[in-house]
Amino acid sequence: MRYKCTEIELHRNDNGKKIYFTKFFCPDSYEDRNILLVHGITSSQHIWDINYKDYSIVRFLAKNGYTVWRLDIGGYGKSDKYEDGFEVTTENAAIDVLTAMEKICELQGVNKVDVMAWSWGSMITGLAAELHPEY
């Protein structure tokens, strides 16, 4: 199967920090379903795409019709770092997730986005849902 992965320009409105944000999909099985994957505390978005046998969650979702969106929470991976490590909080991470969800809705013309998270990412998405349940 052919897959496409592109980086989307994304910055937070409140602090201007760049969020590393990618879109991954398979044109052959595209069904206009969107899912945002949120990583845990010890990794980055690349944990979702392990290039070994059938271990890639990203490729599994894409070949089953999803447009898969991933972000690196601020301070992780390729996202901008914070000068003060104590700014990497669940609250700041929830704002990163909400910024990404708003961008997905804008780009895809949708009102809601499915979410998959693990570890700390589950706490982040729970707070994001509490702050803005409309997504």
Annotate each PLM feature.
Residues 1-30:
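N-terminal cap/lid segment of alpha/beta-hydrolase-fold proteins
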Residues 29, 104-111:
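Glycine-rich phosphate-binding loop signature in dinucleotide/nucleotide-binding domains
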Residues 32, 39-51:
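Active-site glycine-rich loops that stabilize anionic/oxyanionic intermediates
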Residues 35-37, 68:
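Hydrophobic beta-strand anchors of alpha/beta hydrolase catalytic cores
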Residues 46-47, 72-88:
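Glycine-rich "HGGG/HGxG" loop immediately N-terminal to the catalytic nucleophile
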Residues 54-80:
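Conserved alpha/beta-hydrolase
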Residues 87-107:
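Alpha/beta-hydrolase active-site loop
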Residues 111-116, 120-135:
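Conserved hydrolase catalytic core segment
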